[in-house]
Amino acid sequence: MAGSDLLLAGVLFLFAAVIAVPLASRLGIGAVLGYLLAGIAIGPWGLGFISDVDEILHFSELGVVFLMFIIGLELNPAKLWRLRSSIFGVGAAQVMLSAAILGGLLMTTGFSWQAAVVGGIGLAMSSTAMALQLMREKGMSRSESGQLGFSVLLFQDLAVIPALALVPLLAGSADEHVNWLTVGMKVLAFAGMLIGGRYLLRPVFRFIASSGVREVFTAATLLLVLGSALFMEALGLSMALGTFIAGVLLAESEYRHELEIAIDPFKGLLLGLFFISVGMALNLGVLYTHLLWVAVSVAVLVAVKMLVLYLLARLYGLRSSERMQFAGVLSQGGEFAFVLFSLPASQRLFQHDQMALLLVAVTLSMMTTPLLMKGIDKLLSRRLNPADDTDEAPWVEDDKPQVIIVGFGRFGQVIGRLLMANKMRITVLERDISAVNLMRNYGYKVYFGDATQLELLRSAGAEEAQSIVITCNEPEDTMRLVEMCQQHFPHLHILARARGRVEAHELLQAGVTQFSRETFSSALELGRKALITLGMHPHQAQRAQLHFRRLDMRMLRELMPVHTDTVQVSRVREARRELEEIFQREMQKESRQLDGWDEFE
């Protein structure tokens, strides 16, 4: 595709998305279906603006690649190990059962047994991009059904490898026999990627982050994702699987959240392009000439996969209110069918329009999924009483933070140690890479990044956290964070560090009441000790400290409207006289009472 044609195609994609997606969302059918309809409109069977569908479809697979990298970042090896039974149990059972049933049905419609095997495997796979997008839209990502769905999708990605190797064997081509030496070299190269990634990625990103240039960090992230995808494609393996592994290798690193926000904009655009390309690939000519066959095929495909998934969910022990959602979200055919059916060896297996019919059925099944999920939601809302599942608590991820601490200097470290000592889950954001490396050596969950970026806060768990503690060195950063949290995360309890009275006044004006002036409490404590050394009783010194704290806080609030005005000078003098009078009354009161307690430090 020439440069000018590529630019024109890009403009058409953006225009179609800007028009179709908001309309689809307003109609309540979801963004994914909007992208698919936009693709049909501008594709060769619609208005005909774009005809080179195959090249665009291949390029748009990068959206799935970026999505799998972000999913990998959200899963560490320990969590993957916990999911092993659902990945290799439910996932394997779904692929084998669905492929066997669908392959058998294809044989009854005139497919050879070899073509039926390939067709059954291709149809058994679900759309990773579609399913994960719908899971996020429906809030399933952190539920047990969402985790089980992800396990099934992950096994399907793993199953791509043997499926691609099986097709040449079924085609029976002599020049496509299995070269076991080549297979062995690919396995070694794959192992080398795992080992190299495990020990090299973090030092490389540490070196890049130390430059302090954000654009270079973004470029390095793109290089990692695209390089992993290209490497896996060269091995004949799934590009998405390669980037998923790269994400998992960095899931426990201090750069996890910064990597996620660097990739997220590209992921969203490329995923949209992928769905548009799938819509463009819909062959309406085949649909018109074989309308009944296609309609029955789509219905059977969705019904068989839903039945298999529902039964497996029941055997797995998924609670009743989530089984239908789990089965529905994975009921469609997937993007892997386009890859598998388009192989030269596969094309020799299919006769006449068989491959085109299967691809049309897959595309339409993807288009029906958003509507199916909408219907399932309505059905569940009518038939299920929330009380029906009270005996089964929903699965909730246990490593999401309760508190986010921004800045981990001496001030933030004291807060973090106190919270961790009381078993609170914290996530720390710090933009000084040397401090990040030091604190992670001591076992703190510290991540590199600039917390004044909205997406970094969201990635760090601000939507699930209960509180945020802001301990930035710069007052401007503190106020920017306060404004951002109030606008985008209003549920968060905001606690902030103020360097002095001016910053305290600004926080009060912004509506933040939970703050601490960094030297105030320590100065008061030292002042209390000074009173004791001058002969004052510890109990009396303690009360003096409390009176001073209360009066100072009251003054702070009263002077907030005029904290930049000379009016506050006279008010400060009045407050000092008031404080002296309070202390005089306290002295007289204490002289008539017995000692309360002695200093014990």
Swiss-Prot record:
GO molecular function: glutathione-regulated potassium exporter activity
PROSITE patterns: RCK_N (PS51201)
Keywords recorded for this protein, A-Z: Antiport, Cell inner membrane, Cell membrane, Ion transport, Membrane, Potassium, Potassium transport, Transmembrane, Transmembrane helix, Transport
Keyword Ion transport among UniProt keywords: yes
Cell compartment(s), UniProt: Cell inner membrane
Transmembrane intervals: 4-24, 29-49, 55-75, 87-107, 115-135, 152-172, 177-197, 207-227, 230-250, 268-288, 291-311, 326-346, 356-376
Main location: membrane
Superkingdom field: Bacteria
GO cellular component: plasma membrane
Gene Ontology terms describing biological process: proton transmembrane transport
Pfam families: Na_H_Exchanger, TrkA_N
Bilayer topology: Multi-pass membrane protein
Family named by the database record: Belongs to the monovalent cation:proton antiporter 2 (CPA2) transporter (TC 2.A.37) family. KefB subfamily.
Alphabetical list of HAMAP family matching this protein: K_H_efflux_KefB (MF_01412)
Summary of subunit composition and partner proteins: Interacts with the regulatory subunit KefG.
Identification of the protein by name: Glutathione-regulated potassium-efflux system protein KefB
